[in-house]
């Protein structure tokens, strides 16, 4: 069997992997794992990834379970354009510099609104307002550092061309936008960067990948989202409790 990607497009890293594969014409079999329905907790999926998370890449018997590793693997195996993951040592190091910072400062911060506005209420949990406010402040600080440290006078995060760093960052920053927090407002530098990245990726592909998250708030308001099964509640409550 060929390349399989286990994804849920509500997940930021899943979207990054999906967009990358589509943009670069990489053939793959999409295996949708519906997180809201708890499909990641199934015995069948745990045989693919015992960590019970997406995205997952399965290439024959070879399995990868971290989005950055997946993107690097796809870049190398399919010999995509060099700008994505540059061969030049210093340019590549700059991509890794951002990805390291991203994991600590962006990844766990910009997804919190999905939990406070959608996932928590789905299981009857209200996140304290002081946590919501702290998260809002953390996002503002992270955005400022993203601009000051990485974008500066550059067109893209790691230089003058799109890299994996831009794709990973964009997908995280889209998450709060979809949930009613326009964090690009009043930030012309960040807005221009977003427009450049989306123009490169293509409007049609971005719309396709972003549609599930862009519609989730409306679905929640209409109560048309699936309610997570009881076996998912414990892990969801633990994740909510870990919101700083």
Swiss-Prot record:
One annotated GO molecular function: glutathione transferase activity
Keywords for the protein's UniProt record, in alphabetical order: Cytoplasm, Nucleus, Transferase
Quaternary structure, from the entry: Homodimer.
Gene Ontology annotations of biological process type: glutathione metabolic process; response to salicylic acid
Uppermost EC category: transferase
Protein name: Glutathione S-transferase theta-2
Cell compartment(s), UniProt: Cytoplasm, Cytosol; Nucleus
Catalytic activity line of the entry: RX + glutathione = an S-substituted glutathione + a halide anion + H(+)
Chief location: cytoplasm
A Pfam family this chain is assigned to: GST_C
Alphabetical list of PROSITE patterns matching this protein: GST_CTER, GST_NTER
Residues that coordinate or bind glutathione: 40-41, 53-54, 66-67, 104-107
Expression sites by tissue: Highest values found in liver followed by testis, adrenal gland, kidney, lung, brain and skeletal muscle. In liver, highest expression found in central vein limiting plate hepatocytes. In lung, expressed mainly in club cells of the bronchiolar epithelium and, at low levels, in type II alveolar cells.
Domain GST N-terminal per the UniProt entry, residue ranges: 2-82
């Amino acid at each position: 069997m060929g390349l399989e990607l286990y994804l849920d497009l509500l997940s930021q890293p899943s979207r990054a992997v999906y967009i990358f594969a589509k943009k670069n014409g990489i053939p793959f079999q999409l295996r949708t794992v519906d997180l809201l329905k708890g499909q990641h907790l199934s015995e069948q999926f745990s045989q693919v990834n015992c960590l019970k998370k997406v995205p997952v890449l399965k290439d024959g018997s070879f399995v990868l379970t971290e989005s950055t590793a997946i993107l690097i693997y796809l870049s190398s195996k399919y010999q995509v354009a060099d700008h994505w993951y540059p061969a030049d040592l210093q340019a590549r190091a700059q991509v890794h510099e951002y990805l390291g910072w991203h994991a600590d400062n962006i990844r766990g911060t910009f997804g919190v609104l999905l939990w406070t506005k959608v996932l928590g209420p789905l299981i009857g949990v209200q996140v304290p307002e002081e946590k919501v406010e702290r998260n809002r402040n953390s996002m503002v600080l992270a955005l400022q550092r993203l601009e000051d440290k990485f974008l500066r006078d550059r067109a893209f995060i790691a230089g003058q061309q799109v890299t994996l760093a831009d794709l990973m960052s964009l997908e995280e920053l889209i998450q709060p936008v979809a949930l009613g927090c326009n964090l690009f407002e009043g930030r012309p530098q960040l807005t221009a960067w977003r427009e450049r990245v989306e123009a490169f990726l293509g409007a049609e592909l971005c719309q396709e990948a972003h549609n599930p998250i862009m519609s989730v708030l409306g679905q929640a308001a209409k109560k048309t989202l699936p309610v997570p099964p009881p076996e998912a509640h414990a892990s969801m409550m633990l994740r909510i409790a870990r919101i700083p």
